[in-house]
Amino acid sequence: MGGAVSAGEDNDDLIDNLKEAQYIRTERVEQAFRAIDRGDYYLEGYRDNAYKDLAWKHGNIHLSAPCIYSEVMEALKLQPGLSFLNLGSGTGYLSTMVGLILGPFGINHGIELHSDVVEYAKEKLESFIKNSDSFDKFEFCEPAFVVGNCLQIASDSHQYDRIYCGAGVQKDHENYMKILLKVGGILVMPIEDQLTQIMRTGQNTWESKNILAVSFAPLVQPSKNDNGTPDSVGLPPCAVRNLQDLARIYIRRTLRNFINDEMQAKGIPQRAPPKRKRKRVKQRINTYVFVGNQLIPQPLDSEEDEKMEEDSKEEEEKEHIEAMKREEPPQNLLREKIMKLPLPESLKAYLTYFRDK
């Protein structure tokens, strides 16, 4: 599934293509997509395919096409502070993007059938927190993943504001999924080859809308234990943040607001995402000559052709040099503010999430 937009050269180029094709339509979703590099969720040796609008699978690891994730993120209508359940959370790519929108007071849970994929997702999550330049630009709701079959969720589990299922749902499992949703919530899942948005408008009332024709592998049916019944799966608890964690959130928020106020006072605009420069297609100019009664196109002589190519290369090189001059070295102003605080080094490290940059 995929192939709806052109391949990108990098993550920003891919996002530009998704915006141009109207798969990404809101700024909040765009920011989340730009913050998480899709290529980071690919295995080494397969990253060349990361910025194509194609699904990717290697063993148990699977990523849907970017156009699918775009439609899902838009259809979920995410807001800060909501609770989210990802059924078939896979690599954690989608859950991490969702966490950037939910913010620190949301709930972000995922259930995945394969234990090796859960470990992979945890590794990628840790790498994002420790290494990503985007982490300090957001308040983050860290995903929590559990291993299990999403058709075996314990009957006393809590309900969620937003739910996504990343596998094909049979019609007889539709009501099972709906039970997990709060009144006023939104469920997005593939049913009968249609990505469908379902809104719970009341205790027993629903509104459904087809979003996109899709092709998903079906949900894996639960296996039974020795007693002939499936084991139930417990979802992560809805834990309340401790005082230390809350203090870190509010200190970072205060410093971030202070930085924004400083920049506004100095008239420094917030840097917008770079507009990707499209590669120009060179057009060869032809001359025309009469041969008999026919007008035949003839290419320009090779010397003029070569001169055009040389001029084009020189122009591109000049533009590249100018762009390099304008490019500012990356600055992490939040980290700089934290490191200047009159606090013990151990507390500064905690405030930076023990990041090295």
From Swiss-Prot:
Annotated GO biological process: protein ubiquitination
Active site (catalytic residues): S64
Keyword entries, A-Z: Cytoplasm, Lipoprotein, Membrane, Myristate
Localisation per UniProt entry: Cytoplasm; Membrane
Annotated region (CUL-box), positions in chain: 341-344
Lipid tethering residues (N-myristoyl glycine): G2
Residue ranges, annotated region (AdoMet binding motif): 85-94, 160-164, 181-191
S-S bridge residues: none
GO MF annotation, one: ubiquitin-like ligase-substrate adaptor activity
UniProt family annotation: Belongs to the methyltransferase superfamily. L-isoaspartyl/D-aspartyl protein methyltransferase family.
Description of how the protein assembles with itself and partners: Component of the probable ECS(PCMTD1) E3 ubiquitin-protein ligase complex, at least composed of CUL5, ELOB, ELOC, RBX2 and PCMTD1. Interacts (via the BC-box) with ELOB and ELOC; the interaction is direct and stabilizes PCMTD1.
Designated name of the protein: Protein-L-isoaspartate O-methyltransferase domain-containing protein 1
Organism annotation: Mus musculus
